[in-house]
Each structure stands twice: as structure tokens, then as C-alpha cells.
């Protein structure tokens, strides 16, 4: 077939990507483009833009696993269209989530005589937020029953200065006073001797860090539990512990199973963690577990009929 000016053809799907008209155009940055782009061209342009980023497989410093088996990746790709929060439409996905909650609660030694409760989250930051909110609501409910004026001053949260930024966000979002126990060269984790200097009747809880980003240390949660146990004997309102196990919550049970940092301790009422701090798991999920239903105020649990479940 002969071609000339009058029957000149444009790009086709077989046209080499860098021979297409679109490949010579800039990717839109402020508004949608006027013309569509072939999917193979769009894929190549975006992939090339990502070439300037770091290589995730060489990342040894931000607690992110960078490899999963091909079958796991395939399963993820095959379920991308599912909105997992729709419990009635995807009941088996919900069942798998429940199994994970059971397994994690078991790893953290949830007492058999209590009714633990937990959920998945989009990451450990959301898990921390939920754990913090539960402490705030529970403190407020108990304080009101004791006749305390819950509006006279801000409630406060105690944590070491090695905290992860999500706790600062939590305190800003929910109007909580953040009380920081300083770390120094002699105390590269929570200084147990100083904790009670920051605790009072308006303390919603103490956050213990099972893995500090800056130092790699664990707070001495067993010692903290003993300290608060004595304090709570005479306190007007008891102070619980939430363990932020984002960094260590899913590997401590394996590397040091005898370490007492979890629900074996009386005053540890909730624990949060990050799923991707566990080996061979991509980023994208977090978990929070409460030792017993009493530590998760009922007003934070929602019955949603159109999504077919409890949130």
C-alpha cells in the first residue's frame, strides 16, 4: 500500500513509545490534559518519572520491607478492586482480618479471661490515633463519674521525647497537652525515674515505645508498669499504658519471647503496631489491639448497616 499526505496515519498502539506524539509532551501538573494518552505511554512516562527516587531494595533505614513472594504480590493485584470495609460484600476478607487480630492478640499474650478486641488500620499512625482516642474517652468517662471538672484544664499524655510524630499530631488534633519526658545521653529511652513528675489526675495515659526511631532502644515497660501500679493504688484516677509497638511489636515476640512488655503487664491496656515492620510484608497496614472491651469505649464503635458490619 502506498502512503501520501492525504492518507497519512497517526500513532497506533504498535508505534514505539518514544515515537509517539504523547512522549514528547510534559505530564500535566496542574490540570487534566485535554487529550487522552495511550495506557502503555502513560505507564512509561510515569515509570520514568519515578527513576529519580531511591531504590527501595537498598533501603535499610526506614523500617520498610521491600520484598514479598510473587504469590503475595499476585494476590494483592487480584484484590485491588475490593473495598474491604464493606463487610457484607466481602465476608471472607473480613474473616481473614479477624484471624489476624486473633493471631496478634495471641502473640501479645492477651489474657484468656478477658475479651480482647482489635482492628486493622491503614498504618501504625492511625492505630496510635485510635489507641490515644480510646484513652482520652475512657479517662473522660471515668473522670466525670468521679465528679472531676473535665473542662477546667486540658487532659495530658505522657511520652518520652523519642516519640514518633503521630503522637504530636494526636495531641494537636484532640486538644491534649503533650508532656515529654526528656531523653539524654544517660537515658536513651523513657527515664522511668522522671515519669511521675509528669503524671497527674488529668493524665489519660503513658505511651511506652517498643522501639525508638532515633536510638533503637525499647522503653523499660515492665518497670513502667510496676511504677504505675504503685501510683494507681492511691491515685484518684488510674493511669494506663498504651504501647506504641510500631517498630518492635511484631518481632519482639520472636527475638525475645520472654521479654515482658505486652498484655502480660497489668497496666498495658492497648498496643499498636505496623504490619510492615514484620519480615516480607509490604507497607500499607497497621494494627491496634485492646486487652479487653472495657478499654475501648462503646461510643467509638459504630454499627454501620450499609457497610454490613461494625467499625
What is each of the regions a protein language model found here?
Residues 218-256:
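Catalytic PLP-binding core of fold-type I/II PLP enzymes
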Residues 163, 212, 245-249, 277:
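Active-site-proximal loop/turn and secondary-structure-junction residues that shape catalytic pockets
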Residues 122-125, 144-145, 150-226, 260:
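PLP-dependent aminotransferase-class I/II
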Amino acid at each position: 500500500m502506498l502512503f501520501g499526505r492525504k492518507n497519512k496515519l497517526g500513532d497506533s498502539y504498535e508505534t514505539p513509545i518514544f515515537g509517539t506524539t504523547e512522549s514528547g509532551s510534559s505530564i500535566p501538573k496542574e490540570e487534566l490534559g485535554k487529550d487522552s494518552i495511550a495506557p502503555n505511554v502513560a505507564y512509561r512516562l510515569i515509570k520514568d518519572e519515578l527513576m529519580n527516587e531511591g531504590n527501595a531494595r537498598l533501603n535499610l533505614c526506614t523500617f520498610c520491607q521491600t520484598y514479598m513472594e510473587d504469590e503475595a504480590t499476585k494476590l494483592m493485584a487480584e484484590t485491588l478492586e475490593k473495598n474491604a470495609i464493606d463487610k457484607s460484600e466481602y465476608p471472607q476478607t473480613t474473616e481473614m482480618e479477624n484471624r489476624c487480630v486473633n493471631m496478634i492478640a495471641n502473640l501479645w499474650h492477651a489474657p484468656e479471661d478477658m475479651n480482647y478486641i482489635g482492628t486493622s488500620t491503614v498504618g501504625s499512625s492511625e492505630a496510635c490515633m485510635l489507641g490515644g482516642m480510646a484513652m482520652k474517652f475512657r479517662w473522660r468517662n471515668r473522670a466525670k463519674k468521679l465528679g472531676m471538672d473535665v473542662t477546667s484544664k486540658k487532659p495530658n499524655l505522657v511520652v518520652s521525647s523519642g516519640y514518633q510524630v503521630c503522637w504530636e499530631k494526636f495531641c494537636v488534633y484532640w486538644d491534649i497537652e503533650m508532656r515529654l519526658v526528656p531523653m539524654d545521653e544517660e537515658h536513651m529511652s523513657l527515664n522511668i525515674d522522671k515519669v511521675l513528675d509528669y503524671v497527674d489526675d488529668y493524665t489519660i495515659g503513658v505511651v511506652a515505645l517498643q522501639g525508638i526511631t532515633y536510638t533503637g532502644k525499647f522503653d523499660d515497660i515492665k518497670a513502667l508498669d510496676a511504677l504505675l501500679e504503685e501510683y494507681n493504688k492511691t491515685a484518684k484516677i488510674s493511669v494506663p499504658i498504651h504501647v506504641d509497638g510500631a517498630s518492635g511489636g511484631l518481632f519482639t515476640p520472636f527475638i525475645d519471647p520472654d521479654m515482658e512488655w505486652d498484655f502480660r503487664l497489668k497496666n498495658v491496656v492497648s498496643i499498636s503496631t505496623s504490619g510492615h515492620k514484620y519480615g516480607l510484608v509490604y507497607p500499607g497496614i497497621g494494627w491496634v489491639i485492646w486487652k479487653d472491651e472495657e478499654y475501648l469505649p462503646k461510643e467509638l464503635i459504630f454499627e454501620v448497616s450499609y457497610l454490613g458490619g461494625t467499625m
